[in-house]
Amino acid sequence: YGLGSANKDLPAFVVLLSKNTDPQAQPIYARLWGSSFLPSNHQGVKFRSGADPVLYLKDPTGDTPKGRRQLLDSLSELNQIRQAETGNPEINTRIAAYEMAHRMQMSVPDLTDLSKEPESTFKLYGEDARNPGSHAANCLLARRLCERGVRFIQLYHRGWDHHSNIPGRHPKITKETDQGSAALVMDL
């Protein structure tokens, strides 16, 4: 029950990393959303900060959805042949990832389109929610992911590891995170 997504078009585990606003912010490593002892299909899928959270949502110029489907089917056949030869379970994970990416081409644009959100939502989350990649926008996106059946959403906002100028830096970062975080908790 707890593993997998309730939505076949989105991953079960999504990572949202806010745009870096602090030049001294600590780095965030992908191992933080790895699958550890679980199969790799349970690792987190990082959505990029900004207006285009997932690359290649649109087919390349000259390609059609039918052509893309044929390409994926051919690639799947080749991967299945290789999997039969080697018995490597990671090949099945790769096939599933290609299929998920194809389905995400349809679901992510609707997910990230905030134009249908009422003005009251932006009052609740703050005006920064209109700025793709901001913490407030990621909180709103997390709510929308949750509504669509994504079971685990991890929000990262760097810059909390202050070792100097705490009175100068801490108010700035709390201003960036407080309203969006509170709105997300209220919405959930």
Role assignments for model-derived ranges:
Residues Y1-L188:
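Ligand-binding pockets and gating/stacking loops
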